[in-house]
Amino acid sequence: MLSPKRTRFRKQHRGRMKGKSCRGNRICFGRYALQALEPAWITARQIEAGRRAITRYARRGGKIWVRIFPDKPVTLRPTETRMGSGKGSPEYWVAVVKPGRILYEMGGVSETVARAAISIAASKMPIRSQFIRLEI
């Protein structure tokens, strides 16, 4: 599972997901991509599930690029704990995704294979997304 090797601070504020993604919204490496249409936190488990789905479908052919990285810790308090006594401990990591952000890229395969593989990965994501291809 993806997570940072080290961070400056153990815990982070939740923050807000305003506006569109101004970075990471163009295809850079492959020919086909999965683009987010909604804002969300995508967990490291969901990213890994999508990556595995694409890899399994594409088998040996092609190359896959994961364009998001979970760098935000999400804290949870233990169940049946009273309020107070500080913030909970970090439980898992999420990537903050805004609309327009590229999640996965694919290259070296035909469009039909890429479309099918990316649609399987899209079903593993908690948001609506679209298949896009590099216009040359």
Curated annotation (Swiss-Prot):
Protein name: Large ribosomal subunit protein uL16c
Start and end residues of each stretch annotated as Disordered: 1-20
InterPro entries membership: Ribosomal_uL16, Ribosomal_uL16_bact-type, Ribosomal_uL16_CS, Ribosomal_uL16_dom, Ribosomal_uL16_sf
The species this protein was found in: Agrostis stolonifera (Creeping bentgrass)
Record-linked PANTHER family: 50S/60S RIBOSOMAL PROTEIN L16, LARGE RIBOSOMAL SUBUNIT PROTEIN UL16M
Listed GO CC annotations: chloroplast; mitochondrial large ribosomal subunit
Pfam families tied to this protein: Ribosomal_L16
NCBIfam families: rplP_bact (TIGR01164)
Subunit structure: Part of the 50S ribosomal subunit.
Annotated TM spans: none
Designated gene of the protein: rpl16
One Gene Ontology molecular-function label: rRNA binding
Subcellular location: Plastid, Chloroplast
